[in-house]
Structure formats: C-alpha cells, structure tokens
C-alpha cells in the first residue's frame, strides 16, 4: 500500500500541535536565537540540564539520579571577568538508502557526509559580558572560533571565490570541490550595556528562528530545513536590545544582510529587529524580522556582469510553552520572500513543531515535525516542492560536561510541478530515512 506521506505528516502535526506544550527558554550567553533550546542550563555556556523542577514534584516521574555537579572548565575564573571555554562534538550520520559518499545525506543540513564519522565542531570562545547592573555602564566582547565538518557551512557567504574574512578557510576539499572540513569565526563583536539597553557591534548569531549553529544549544543532531535554507546564521552590523518594559524584549538594528562579514562586497543593507513577550510565566512569543536590500553579485567581467539580488523580507515567529511535568512544546513559523529579481520572486515558508519530555536529569526525549515549502526551487535543491520531515531523538547527559544525541529522521519530498523531483540519495529518491548520533564534550 502506498503511504500518503503528506497526509500522514499533517495529521501528526495536528495531533502534536493540539496538545499545547514547551518552555519559555532563555538563550543564555550564546548571543543566538532568544528562544534556543538548551540554554535553560544553570550555566548558560553549557547545555547540561533542562529546567525539570516540575517533573520531580507531583508528576510522579523518575527521580534525579545523575548527581550532576558544576561543569568542569579548562580555564577557571579570573579577576578580569573573562570566560574562556568551548566544546568538541563528533558523530556519525547515515542513511538507509545505502549511499555512502561525501554528500550522501544531502540535502539534510550540516549532516551531508555519510561515508565516515565526522568531527563536527571543535569550538573555542572567549567572552566578557557587559555588566550594567554592577557598573551602570560597561563594555564587553565575544569571539568564537570553529573548526570541523560544520566549518564550511558556517563561513561568511557572499564572496564567490574571493578569500574574505573566513570564506573558503577549508582544510579538506575533494577534487570535485566538495568542502568537507574548514574553519570559521562566526562571532566577533563588542557590547555596550547601560540601564535597560544592550548594544552589540560586530558579527553575531542571528536572533531569528529557533535552532542555531552551536551544537550544545540544539536538542537534535540534524537541523530543520528552515534553519539551514530559510534563515540567516549570522549578521554583521549593529543590534540594540531594550528590556525596559515588563515581560518584554525589543531588538532593532542594521546589518549587512545574511551571513556576510565585515567586507560587505555585495552591498547588502537590511533592518534586523523583533519583539519577545512573556504571555505567562510558562509561555513566550517571539517575532523577528529581517528586511531590506539583498545586494548584488558580479558573475562575470564587464558592465553586464553584475546581477541584482533584489530585496529580502523574512520573518520568524516562535511560541514556546512549558506544560509542566517535564513536558515542553515549541511552534515555529517562517516566511521569506526575495523580490525584484530577474525571473520572478522567490518564496519560502514552513512550520516546525517540537515536543520534548525530560525524564530526569540524565535523559530527555524529543520529536520534531517539520514542513518546509520551497515554492520556486530557489532554496534547497533546485526543485520546487514541499519537504516533510519527522525526527525522533534523545539526549543522554551522564554528567555536566557530556551530551549524547541519538536520532532517527524520516524525510519526504513532494514536488509542486509534477516533475517528479528526487532530492535525496544524490538525486535518486524522493524520500529517505536517516540515523545517527553525536557526543558533545564541553569545557
């Protein structure tokens, strides 16, 4: 019997969505998405434990037996207020189609290598947080360096073959041009804090969406289509944050578009902003937007070699709700439009839903159901259609420095124009089942 994947996915999403669930989460010190998964940890730099107080009260769930203590750090405290730390994450991701190549898992974001285990992130950061409460006015900074299989996906885009910033800092490239390993500097910024204001200047992670690049901040080993194909990873520019209103955070600033660095070769210029509001003690709604000129790119020499990339508009809405008893739910909707370009506008949009259950301090399980529409075939694999995925995973945290993330993922593509697109298994199939796990060690 042929399964109607589309109907099954939508039905599952409706059932999960109807059970209202997930926690209003704090992005900690990663300076990334304000609703990111795992920075509920008591130490914002290490995704060690979700808030699970409710689970051990009247809910009758498993007791805490892990004995998690203070996370071990390679560099201890100092009198300058400086934090130095990082993590190493490594794992394996494969598929049941038997495609064992450098791109066998495509178009699954960040997990394209299917023929070998990978060191995904060897990450080091140095940070001093601006402390306005103690000093009234204070300055801070942060710098992040990444090497690994996630490096090429995190580098600054928009430079073609030009070596600008960290673009093309690749340490392993095949003869076919496949970038396997590389380095990146995704964050380098200064901050100024006074009163209820915090201003960031430099290159920093986006405030948009739910998932982000740093491995400890994400429940799942793989990423949603929206995160990789529909949202920016980083911005370069200035971003102000204001917390003077009750239960409300407001952002506003100017950036060099998406994923560019300090050399704005394409001439992008966009507004980045949003608002986050705590509807209740358990529920938070966050809306963010990035809009403006997406610049232009030179594809050939001569007066006709410059292509206008038009304008960009993209917004993301994320609702998080803490059900209690260890259950939490996240709803995300993204919408993007690239307009005023040759060949017509490009549209993309989607819905993600997450359901998490923390069993105890050691174990959590989660589900992610997603639908991503690449309406014009401009974002994912060059074929217009709908991408559906259902991911099921667990997090095992044997101590405060280690996270192990196994998962299985079911993906299905439904083309829009009847052309029978096959984006999986290197262009041979319209569906695929993936599996894998990684381990993260923080320091």
PLM features: residue spans?
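Transmembrane beta-barrel domains of outer membrane proteins
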Residues: 75, 125-129, 190-193, 239-241, ...
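Glycine- and aromatic-enriched membrane insertion/assembly motifs of diderm outer-membrane
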Residues: 83, 109-149
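Hydrophobic, lipid-facing positions within transmembrane beta-strands of outer-membrane proteins
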Residues: 120-124, 183-190, 197, 234-238, ...
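Surface-exposed coil loops of outer-membrane beta-barrel proteins
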Residues: 97-114, 152-189, 193-276, 286-293, ...
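Short loop/turn motifs that connect adjacent beta-strands in outer-membrane beta-barrel proteins
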Residues: 60-61, 65-84, 97, 130-139, ...
